[in-house]
């Protein structure tokens, strides 16, 4: 949520900055009109309350003088009705103002590439060399299906498209990956959390998924509850409505959860494989910081995500997303994209974002600065990493010509000595 006081003070600046995110100037004008109307209605209410107090005083004086107070009583009754009518107008106006503010995205940070499309992202660095194959590399779904460790067909019978069974060493690889990710993050000072997977609408509003992106999630019929689209939601809401002791900041938390997404608007995109699923595992990182810490912490969070890829030996690059491509709540986002040899392109595996006080303002999360003044915390979130996409990249980058897949060295301890996934060991029940 943006600060209405700041919008009131710098309307042209907000129009200019938010125009880079597709916001029309008229949307800011509407917010300002509703804000002006609100202040006018509140002033009228205060005037009437003063009038009511004066009428009450007249009634008291008349009664003490044993005179008729009928006129003052009638006046007070009328003023009361007028105040009630104004209160209803204030409530309706506040609802409109709140709704309009809730649809405005965060202001992009200085230096974020300006574009109304995803084109124009700035590459910050490229790490690792793409493997040169002496055979035609297969897509991850082909490798997984041939080995029997990814079963899209049976998942389709049970759940429909964009679902998968991980089987045998496929399930073990998924588990090894998220355990490795969590272990690495905890070494960097993150506290592991196992959060709820179903949250209420207020939690979804707090992190910015609601009201604008309701069509992208799965909601429980007849209840004000939603399956989480990312662990960012329950993790960021952990301190909602609280004043966090300043000496605790920054706070780092991490969690593995399933993520549930309807993928509305994705028809025809990535219809095969693990890239775009309705349900997928993801390890999330969330930080709460003081206001002067968040940009340094964004760099650290991005490095935490990169650490996983570097230890897995996967080539990737880091880009800064454009003003219109980053998430609704973000002021700046760094994406990590993995090299997928069969697709011959990079695919996103992590987004690390600084949301400044945008989410904290919605969730009323604060701390006291050195002067004892309440300040909103800054929140950051990042994938560390999307597990299925990382697994897909391992299958493609570590594939062998005979169809087997070499297990990255750092994951071998999770496999109790197995170093390669083959047709013979991939799915034990297939060998009976």
Curated annotation (Swiss-Prot):
<dbReference type="GO" id="GO:0005737">
    <property type="term" value="C:cytoplasm"/>
</dbReference>
<keyword id="KW-0963">Cytoplasm</keyword>
<dbReference type="InterPro" id="IPR010978">
    <property type="entry name" value="tRNA-bd_arm"/>
</dbReference>
<dbReference type="GO" id="GO:0016260">
    <property type="term" value="P:selenocysteine biosynthetic process"/>
</dbReference>
<dbReference type="GO" id="GO:0006434">
    <property type="term" value="P:seryl-tRNA aminoacylation"/>
</dbReference>
<dbReference type="InterPro" id="IPR002314">
    <property type="entry name" value="aa-tRNA-synt_IIb"/>
</dbReference>
<feature type="binding site">
    <location>
        <begin position="348"/>
        <end position="351"/>
    </location>
    <ligand>
        <name>ATP</name>
    </ligand>
</feature>
<feature type="binding site">
    <location>
        <begin position="261"/>
        <end position="263"/>
    </location>
    <ligand>
        <name>ATP</name>
    </ligand>
</feature>
<dbReference type="InterPro" id="IPR033729">
    <property type="entry name" value="SerRS_core"/>
</dbReference>
<dbReference type="InterPro" id="IPR015866">
    <property type="entry name" value="Ser-tRNA-synth_1_N"/>
</dbReference>
<dbReference type="InterPro" id="IPR002317">
    <property type="entry name" value="Ser-tRNA-ligase_type_1"/>
</dbReference>
<keyword id="KW-0547">Nucleotide-binding</keyword>
<dbReference type="Pfam" id="PF02403">
    <property type="entry name" value="Seryl_tRNA_N"/>
</dbReference>
<feature type="binding site">
    <location>
        <position position="383"/>
    </location>
    <ligand>
        <name>L-serine</name>
    </ligand>
</feature>
<feature type="binding site">
    <location>
        <position position="284"/>
    </location>
    <ligand>
        <name>L-serine</name>
    </ligand>
</feature>
<protein>
    <recommendedName>
        <fullName>Serine--tRNA ligase</fullName>
        <ecNumber>6.1.1.11</ecNumber>
    </recommendedName>
</protein>
<keyword id="KW-0030">Aminoacyl-tRNA synthetase</keyword>
<keyword id="KW-0436">Ligase</keyword>
<dbReference type="InterPro" id="IPR045864">
    <property type="entry name" value="aa-tRNA-synth_II/BPL/LPL"/>
</dbReference>
<dbReference type="InterPro" id="IPR042103">
    <property type="entry name" value="SerRS_1_N_sf"/>
</dbReference>
<keyword id="KW-0648">Protein biosynthesis</keyword>
<keyword id="KW-0067">ATP-binding</keyword>
<dbReference type="GO" id="GO:0140096">
    <property type="term" value="F:catalytic activity, acting on a protein"/>
</dbReference>
<feature type="binding site">
    <location>
        <begin position="230"/>
        <end position="232"/>
    </location>
    <ligand>
        <name>L-serine</name>
    </ligand>
</feature>
<dbReference type="Pfam" id="PF00587">
    <property type="entry name" value="tRNA-synt_2b"/>
</dbReference>
<comment type="function">
    <text>Catalyzes the attachment of serine to tRNA(Ser). Is also able to aminoacylate tRNA(Sec) with serine, to form the misacylated tRNA L-seryl-tRNA(Sec), which will be further converted into selenocysteinyl-tRNA(Sec).</text>
</comment>
<comment type="subunit">
    <text>Homodimer. The tRNA molecule binds across the dimer.</text>
</comment>
<dbReference type="GO" id="GO:0004828">
    <property type="term" value="F:serine-tRNA ligase activity"/>
</dbReference>
<dbReference type="GO" id="GO:0016740">
    <property type="term" value="F:transferase activity"/>
</dbReference>
<comment type="pathway">
    <text>Aminoacyl-tRNA biosynthesis; selenocysteinyl-tRNA(Sec) biosynthesis; L-seryl-tRNA(Sec) from L-serine and tRNA(Sec): step 1/1.</text>
</comment>
<dbReference type="GO" id="GO:0005524">
    <property type="term" value="F:ATP binding"/>
</dbReference>
<comment type="similarity">
    <text>Belongs to the class-II aminoacyl-tRNA synthetase family. Type-1 seryl-tRNA synthetase subfamily.</text>
</comment>
<dbReference type="InterPro" id="IPR006195">
    <property type="entry name" value="aa-tRNA-synth_II"/>
</dbReference>
